[in-house]
Design a protein with these regions (language model features):
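Short amphipathic alpha-helical segments at helix-loop
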Residues: 31-37, 41, 72-78
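N-terminal leader/signal peptides at the extreme start of proteins
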Residues: 1-15
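Alpha-helical hydrophobic helix detector
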Residues: 18, 22-37
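Membrane-proximal amphipathic alpha-helices
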Residues: 38-50
Length: 178
């Protein structure tokens, strides 16, 4: 009888209910907060990668027409010292500058080797587009792409998900200096 009476009094008692609610909800709220933080961090890194690829493509699309051996491929254009403008474009993508000294990477762990730059052509023999390189019917596009394996803070593992692999891509038509 006393056990039943004690159980009824505990059931009706509301002293300490806030402590119990807090103990139950705190882990759930911390997990939600951590997940929101992790996903926002991934989106932030993606925007940095997109900005880097965009900047690199724009830079190489405006590279001067100094082609060795009469080649008109902007991916093969070099400066007076013989350095490929493509190398400078990769540095701009990763560091935000043509020089790597004194500059930090936009995203930690992202290297110039992760950036791929190609210069595919498209046919302009019909003359529909302004010819920026005389003597050829091909127009060039500058395509910069990258892939980055995002190191996780651990919340993806809680959900049994693998960390995302962030990719970014930007394309510009080669227009030369101006």
């Amino acid at each position: 009888m006393t056990l039943l009476r004690t159980a009824r009094s505990l059931w009706r008692d509301n002293v300490g209910s806030a402590l119990l609610e807090g103990a139950v909800l705190t882990p759930v709220l911390l997990a939600v907060l951590g997940g929101v933080y992790e996903f926002s961090w991934v989106f932030y890194k993606q925007k940095l990668l997109e900005a880097g690829t965009r900047d690199a493509a724009r830079y190489l699309a405006r590279a001067p027409l100094t082609f060795p051996g009469g080649n008109t491929d902007p991916c093969l254009a070099t400066d007076a010292g013989g350095t490929l403008y493509k190398t400078y474009a990769k540095n701009i993508a990763v560091y935000g500058s043509t020089s790597t000294s004194g500059f930090n990477q936009r995203v930690n762990g992202w290297a110039t080797g992760d950036v791929t730059i190609t210069c595919p052509t498209f046919d302009n023999s019909a003359g529909n587009y302004l010819q920026n390189v005389q003597g050829t019917t091909n127009l060039y596009r500058v395509l910069v792409s990258t892939s980055y394996a995002e190191p996780s803070l651990g919340f993806f593992a809680l959900l049994r998900l693998s960390p995302p692999n962030i990719t970014a891509r930007h394309e510009e038509r080669y227009i030369g200096p101006g």
